Amino acid sequence: MKETLQKLRTDLIPIYGKGESDAIIRLIFHYLKGWNLTDMLIHQDDELSPFMKDEIDKILARLLKMEPIQYITGEARFHGMDLVVRPGVLIPRPETDELVDIIIDENKDREDLSVLDVCTGSGCIAIALARNLPFSKVTALDFSKEAIAVALENVQKTKTHVRIIEQDIFNWDPAEKYDIIVSNPPYVLDSEALTMEKNVLDYEPHEALFVRDDNPLAYYRRIAEIAKKALENNGKLYFEINPLKAVELEEMLKKMGFEKVETYRDSYGKLRFLKAEL
């Protein structure tokens, strides 16, 4: 096994760096063997079977083409859960995990909350909130059939109660009221693609990532319009945002009638989250 580990590190570190390479290697062995880091240390002197070596070689070949490890294994870790992900559905990010923590921390003492997650993707936000907000009723929307299928799988896998609905928000008039509306919509500017990693550009769904430079707040504007109709009194709107557009978004929401608008920084110090109340 030591030789295999050394080969993985030798091939991956020049592309991914040491920290990410080590994380990828742990994911490979968790996927193939169910091992954690302690298990890897215990078995480091073991001889891997020819079958296992062949499987690792296949995974390595895909990684060298910059395919995300989450699409290779079909899983992504999010908020303590192993969620299903597939090509066509955005891989959950650590920053989104931070957004979930903010929402839980600010609403943990409230019960029977009605929650709407817009642009749910894999369902990661909706499922994490359903698991952590007591007796909450959670609904999740997406227009993508691929996302809806994956979100439904994740609801079943995690045994959570989340209603998943296929819906284009630009052609939707909400009939229900919600205490919390949350969204991590597409927010990366088309022009930012020039500086993005190849594994994101070549494999992840562009429609879940990018917005036009000449209309960067389109999703936020529409979701805010929905929130004005659908938020209960004292309801809260939460967004994950593009730091480049934080000030512009805050100004837009205030003009739309949201009086309490607050931004939060992520663990890297970037303005990444926003809360608004009417």
Language model regions located:
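Mobile active-site "lid"/loop adjacent to the S-adenosyl-L-methionine
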Residues: 187-219
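Conserved Class I SAM-dependent methyltransferase catalytic core
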Residues: 84, 213-277
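Short loop/edge segments at beta-strand edges and connector loops
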Residues: 73, 165-167, 241, 265
